[in-house]
């Protein structure tokens, strides 16, 4: 529903050009003002300093141990008690908060988008802005307050992130549905995630994210600002079920859901509960972030009647889908296909549909003596009018057990999508069946290599035809596919030699294939020579190759260093790898390799910071890695851009020394290709070339201050030490067994 909300705040998208670039009075820093108001396009490096230890009230807390100490059955029993204990301050529809908890869990997980892995339930972000105040999350603040007694009782043994998802599962189970399972392991954070791009709009329900016919901007999935998925009234409130079907399939597809999973989720979720649109939405007050202090973090206070219970207003729609809203059934499909539908308005004026020639068979949420006519949303009718979804819907209607299984699996996928591989799952209800979307890696079934083996393998790798550059690039390509947003990717599994990673442009497929062949030969030779069960995996060998190369490059620079290496990675197979599912991990840019693909929405330096953010790097770690990778000659296609050294493949601090050299003047390349030329200030002779990413470390004041640390005459040992530490961090980002 198109409810008016205060604007988020107009964004100044114009670059600062001389003089003060702002108008009006600047805000106090405590009000959100600061440098960004003067220079709105300033690179935001704060995304590389997320969730600092100083902001964590728990300190060095072992959540895994705490969660595993829980009596999960007792927690679930306490949640179940909450569900059927109606509170006067927010009465339960049909005497059961189960549907409200399902919506809370759904919307916690449903912000996930597969394109960058951001969003989702993993850190409990629904507690914070902007999500706690999105129009689509209206009155979910009440759901979390209802759960407070449970959270209070069990304290830090269960995170809010886990509790919200568990409450959704308990709601389903207590209403007669058999879930697929539940895994804990979501760790709370203590601040909003401000590195997530939710869209360009500066007002609720705006849709500037579209271009062309209806092309949705990447990486977004939702159709409008402040919605989790689609507009239930139809595109921009237009009650066209067929047009809404296009949005549904696009949006759910961008979450990583198939069309069958999408149908199952919509129908399964809408088997329970109701929507709320009892009256004029203009009577609803401000969202939590804009509400007055005395409301204590609760928003959407309504002056329509009592403002709650039978008078509640949330979406503005007033729909009850089934005859048994607190019981699992096949009613949704029976009713969807059992009637013809005509457009009507809710009491709040929202577009919805009512059954023609129907009897009032739908229960009232608060008066058992009353019955209602069957009603549906525009997006519900999409499941009937869209040819592809109709076939699935009719099959589910005629095969209730198949529908129940599909919903159970889709719900589990929805609520666990950003939790990472099964090795991160906690608790007694983790299902034994592994799903393809979990990126399965077989368990290590052999003895691991020891220190002597590692030393011998490093010698053999360095004696091969492979260069330091090739070894570094291959290890980086494998490990840097990791995303800290949803814990996907990384070197474990050895997927660098499988499709689609083997064919990614940034990985230089032809050269990569040659490197893989050599490493596989070394692996086969080593494994064949063993008499017992000792083996080296290909995944371990890729990382070990990088380790050997970095150590040799340091020796070339006159520094002896031992790069840490812990074996234990396993090799997966092409059959256990979904090429379409992995395609979203392909880098469109990688500033660490000076790679910039085509049609990127932001300049290369912004994309570098985004990549560093996904790799969970700090600004110093990003800085030292870029400088080190440049002198290791690890650029895409061995480009000379930023290779500011006369001795490539030596781990020197030359990149920083030469970048900050005042005897070099930089200017845009005459090729007008976005690159730069560094010339001798005295002679005008060309000395170097560089990219926007390279020059960033001399231009940006914060990054220049970091570059200066590594450019001093006494910096070489520290540079090598810090590079090795950052390199080792990236190589082990997906080693959850080491945590």
Swiss-Prot record:
Active site: 107 (proton acceptor)
GO biological process: cellular response to hydrogen peroxide; hydrogen peroxide catabolic process
GO-annotated cellular components: cytosol
Top-level enzyme category: oxidoreductase
Protein name: Catalase-peroxidase
Cofactor list: heme b
Species of the source: Nocardia farcinica (strain IFM 10152)
UniProt crosslink position (Tryptophyl-tyrosyl-methioninium (Trp-Tyr) (with M-255)): 106-229
Catalysis: reaction(s): H2O2 + AH2 = A + 2 H2O; 2 H2O2 = O2 + 2 H2O
């Amino acid at each position: 529903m198109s409810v008016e909300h205060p604007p988020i705040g107009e964004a100044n998208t114009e670059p600062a050009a001389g003089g003060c670039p702002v108008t009006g009075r600047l805000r106090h820093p405590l009000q959100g003002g600061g440098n960004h108001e003067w220079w709105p396009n300033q690179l935001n490096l704060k995304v590389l300093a997320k969730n600092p230890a100083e902001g964590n009230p728990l300190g060095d807390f072992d959540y895994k141990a705490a969660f595993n100490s829980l009596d999960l059955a007792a927690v679930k029993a306490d949640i179940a008690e909450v569900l059927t204990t109606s509170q006067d301050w927010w009465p339960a529809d049909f005497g059961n908060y189960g549907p409200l908890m399902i919506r809370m869990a759904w919307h916690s997980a449903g912000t996930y988008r597969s394109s960058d892995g951001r969003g989702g339930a993993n850190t409990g972000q629904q507690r914070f802005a902007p999500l706690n105040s999105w129009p689509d999350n209206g009155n979910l603040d009440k759901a979390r307050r209802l759960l407070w007694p449970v959270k209070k009782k069990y304290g830090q043994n269960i995170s809010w992130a886990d509790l919200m998802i568990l409450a959704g599962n308990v709601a389903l189970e207590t209403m007669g549905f058999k879930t697929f399972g539940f895994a804990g392991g979501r760790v709370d954070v203590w601040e909003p995630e401000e590195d997530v791009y939710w869209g360009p709009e500066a007002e609720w329900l705006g849709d500037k994210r579209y271009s062309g016919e209806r092309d949705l901007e990447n990486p977004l999935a939702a159709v409008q600002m402040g919605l989790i998925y689609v507009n239930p009234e139809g595109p921009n409130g237009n009650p066209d079920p067929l047009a809404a079907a296009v949005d549904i399939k696009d949006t759910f597809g961008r979450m990583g859901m198939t069309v069958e999973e999408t149908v199952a989720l919509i129908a399964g979720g809408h088997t329970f509960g109701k929507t709320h649109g009892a009256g004029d939405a203009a009577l609803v007050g401000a969202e939590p972030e804009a509400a007055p202090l005395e409301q204590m973090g609760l928003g959407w206070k309504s002056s329509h009647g009592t403002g709650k219970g039978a008078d509640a207003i949330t979406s503005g729609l007033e729909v009850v889908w089934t005859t048994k809203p607190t019981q699992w059934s096949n009613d949704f499909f029976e009713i969807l296909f059992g009637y013809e539908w005509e457009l009507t308005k809710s009491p709040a004026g929202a577009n919805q549909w009512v059954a023609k020639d129907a009897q009032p068979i739908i229960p009232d949420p608060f008066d058992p003596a009353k019955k209602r006519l069957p009603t549906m949303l525009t997006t519900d009718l999409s499941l009937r009018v869209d040819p592809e979804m109709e076939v699935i819907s009719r099959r589910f209607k005629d095969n209730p057990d198949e529908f129940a299984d599909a919903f159970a699996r889709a719900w589990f996928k929805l609520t666990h999508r950003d939790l990472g591989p099964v090795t991160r799952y906690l608790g007694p209800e983790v299902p034994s069946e592994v799903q393809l979307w979990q990126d399965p890696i077989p368990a290590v079934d052999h003895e691991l290599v020891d220190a002597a083996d590692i030393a011998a393998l490093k010698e053999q790798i360095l004696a091969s035809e492979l260069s330091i550059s090739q070894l570094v690039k291959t290890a980086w390509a494998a490990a840097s596919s990791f995303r800290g947003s949803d814990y996907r990717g990384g070197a474990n599994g050895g997927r660098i030699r499988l499709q689609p990673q083997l064919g990614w442009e940034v990985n230089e497929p032809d050269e990569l294939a040659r490197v893989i062949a050599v490493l596989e030969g070394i692996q086969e030779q080593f494994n064949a020579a063993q008499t017992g069960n000792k083996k080296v995996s290909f995944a371990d060998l890729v990382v070990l190759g990088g380790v050997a190369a970095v150590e040799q490059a340091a020796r070339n620079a006159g520094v002896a260093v031992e790069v840490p290496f812990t074996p234990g990675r396993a090799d997966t197979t092409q059959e256990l790898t979904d090429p379409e599912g992995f395609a979203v991990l392909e880098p469109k840019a990688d500033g660490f390799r000076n790679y910039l693909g085509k049609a990127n929405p932001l300049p290369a330096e912004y994309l570098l910071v985004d990549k560093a953010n996904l790799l969970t790097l700090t600004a110093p770690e990003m800085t030292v890695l870029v400088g080190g990778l440049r002198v290791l000659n690890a650029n895409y296609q061995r480009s000379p851009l930023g290779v500011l050294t006369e001795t490539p493949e030596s781990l020197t601090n030359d990149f920083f020394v030469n970048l900050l050299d005042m005897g070099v003047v930089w200017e845009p390349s005459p090729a007008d290709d976005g690159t730069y030329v560094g010339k001798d200030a005295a002679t005008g002779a060309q000395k170097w070339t560089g990219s926007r990413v390279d020059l960033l470390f001399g231009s940006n004041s914060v990054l220049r201050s970091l570059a200066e640390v590594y450019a001093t005459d006494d910096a070489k040992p520290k540079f090598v030490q810090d590079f090795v530490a950052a390199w080792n961090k990236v190589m082990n980002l997906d080693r959850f067994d080491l945590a």
